[in-house]
Amino acid sequence: MEHVAIIDGQRHTVDAIQPVPGLRVYKHPHRDYGIGTYPVCLGHHEGRRIARTECTADAIDAARDLAEMADWTRSETEIQAAPGLAEKVADYLAGHNAIWAGGYR
């Protein structure tokens, strides 16, 4: 599926998959695969990135786990207003092979 990702304030159309409702996984348009590059993004369906991972499998696993924390089909505004969600997401990502991308904080 096509996904419009917002990266560094710019809109980019990328190919994506949706492993769970509301969350998309796609390759960052300006990062190549390689050790420590974290080129795969996990993002909200409205475009905001949540995390970067080293591979698609890690992003899919993160999406499945984050799906248990919130209804990601809601708007970004509703999700940002959820008490404690940003901290839960950041704590989860810190313990997994992912880099917090600054979304929902």
Residue spans for each PLM region:
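Short, isolated positions in well-ordered beta-strands
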Residues: 12-14, 25, 47-50
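A short, exposed loop/beta-hairpin motif centered on an aromatic-Gly-Thr core
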Residues: 45-58
